Every structure is written in structure tokens, then in C-alpha cells.
């Protein structure tokens, strides 16, 4: 898998790439990540990539020429080009799984300022949001989407860990505990100390259902529908 990120601020990705699971995935050749400053593709002598809106309005708009030039420079036959924007479809675990199974190369365009010239839609495949809120730029969403995809690649995380995670089968993850056994009067549930594997598995499943029903009723309904 290769992930190309087009951003005006490539330095913001340095720490994310150099640490923990993402760094190991890169070292093990499980993923290639390139962060490209699309300012390099502008023909403006002052390296400007934004301009005022036609029709007036607050905020500057990203010009289309440098972004399209950058896309064309790196796009291949199996590239999937996406734009991070609050106007997009909300990204979720199911989409992350689809990305892994369908694409070898994902290009993520991280927005900034007031957004993109609307004509960018002729040159991309989809728009995605990471939630119903607005951020100062698309750098964090591009990292979130990339991270969610990379951890699903073969060998990046153990299969047993992925099987019990939140959103697997539309359920949130179960509670976990470690030492000490008792902390300020709060004790680890006795059933987890029983050594009875089936009872522990049943308890954890019940906890998943309870937590999902309380915190994510929309997800719980999908779980119920999937059981039918």
C-alpha cells in the first residue's frame, strides 16, 4: 500500500510518521507514505496557492491548478483520490476496510483556508469527513484516515487484536483491566479472575452490547439488524 498526502504543511506529519506502529509499518515495507507540498506545483511566481472568492465572501479559496497538477504527477491506474472536507461522507471502519481490500494507492488531499475551488470534484473520486465538526485544516483528518487504513494492513497489528476491537461486528470494545486488583475501592470484576474462558467471553460480549447500546444506539441498531 502507498499513501500520498498533498498538503501545504508537510512538516506537521513528521512526528506521526516517525513513531510507533506507523514507523514500524514503514520500516517493514508494509506501507509507503509520501507527503507532498502541493505549493511546489504552482506556476505563481510568489508561490501563492489561494485566491479570493468569486461572488465575494469570507476566507481565501485554494486554487485548482496546483492541486490538479500534483494529482496528475503522482496518480496511477489504481489510485483512489480523496479530499478531506466537512462536507464529505463520514469516514468509518467499514470504509477503512474497503480501502485496504480495493486500493494499492490512496491519494489524500488535505484542505486549508476556506476550502477548495469546487471544480476539484472533477479530478477526485470522493470526499470524506471525520465527523460533524470543523478543523483548521485537513492535516489531522488525513492522518486519521491513513492511520485507520494502515493498521489494517497484513502484519501491522496482530489479527487477534483486530478481531476484538471497537466496530468489529458493529460493537464497541469491551472494558479491560490490569493490576492492581483493587484501586481506591474499585475492584476488577470477579469473573475475569475465574479462569473460565467461556464465561469470560460471554461477559465481555454482554459488556460490548451494553456499552454500544448506551453510547452508540445507531451502531447498536446495525448490530441487531446484522444478527437477523
Swiss-Prot record:
Q: Which organism is it from?
A: Ureaplasma parvum serovar 3 (strain ATCC 700970)
Ligand binding (S-adenosyl-L-methionine): 111, 130-135
Q: What does this protein do?
A: Specifically methylates guanosine-37 in various tRNAs.
Q: Matching SUPFAM superfamilies, A to Z?
A: alpha/beta knot
Entry-linked InterPro entries: Alpha/beta_knot_MTases, tRNA_m1G_MeTrfase_C_sf, tRNA_m1G_MeTrfase_TrmD, tRNA_m1G_MTases_N, tRNA_MeTrfase_TRMD/TRM10
Gene Ontology cellular-component terms for this entry are: cytosol
Q: What are the entry keywords? A: Cytoplasm, Methyltransferase, S-adenosyl-L-methionine, Transferase, tRNA processing
| Protein name as it appears in the record | tRNA (guanine-N(1)-)-methyltransferase
Family the UniProt entry places it in: Belongs to the RNA methyltransferase TrmD family.
